[in-house]
């Protein structure tokens, strides 16, 4: 299935994708309808990864984010295409420069949440091989009751094995194209802090404040270059539990972005939710509307 017009992503279990994440993925289809989106999970992974690509201990010993790191290395090597983490927002078709880049591997400043690769990319091949090695090494140490602390870093199967490859090929334009993530504003809260001449503050707190506790959607849409990379692990849990409608009436940066770029009708949604809540109140208090 070598096809550049595929967007790959991974979420396990599929049935527990937060509603706001579904909105993120909807933006991909909105701006790039000609691309096929393939959502990987345990139910279909073997359809795309040959048996034995990774030792089965990958799925037993490692967290889902680490599994996703190894999976993307293999998927892009075997099939090519675009990899987007599910919490990626496409804000306009401007990002086609990344989708259509002709290098064998493209990345934003070492941020592996969005990748573009040609089938057979040497960088993806080396990444895949190093993941295979690291998975078996972890398994061996664990089986011998050894010290696993050295393996617990979040980048063990992601930037850990990838960065040395990036360094090796960084001057080979055929093999790799590295886009600056601040210049291209994919980490918009970082760009906003620079514009505000305020580089202080905790990254997680800045993320929460920028996207969920205030509304900078106009700033984002005035300055966007086509893509935003969110951090689902940093997203406040109460927002992950909201329905799409309830999320969209939050009046924050992210809800504002979705409403504007997907051309959604806020007033209609507000009225629908208000009516639904009113009906719930009547059901809870049946005597309140009896004559």
Predicted regions and their residues:
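Glycosyltransferase-associated regions of secretory-pathway enzymes
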Residues: 1-68, 84-291
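Small-residue hinge/turn detector
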Residues: 69-81
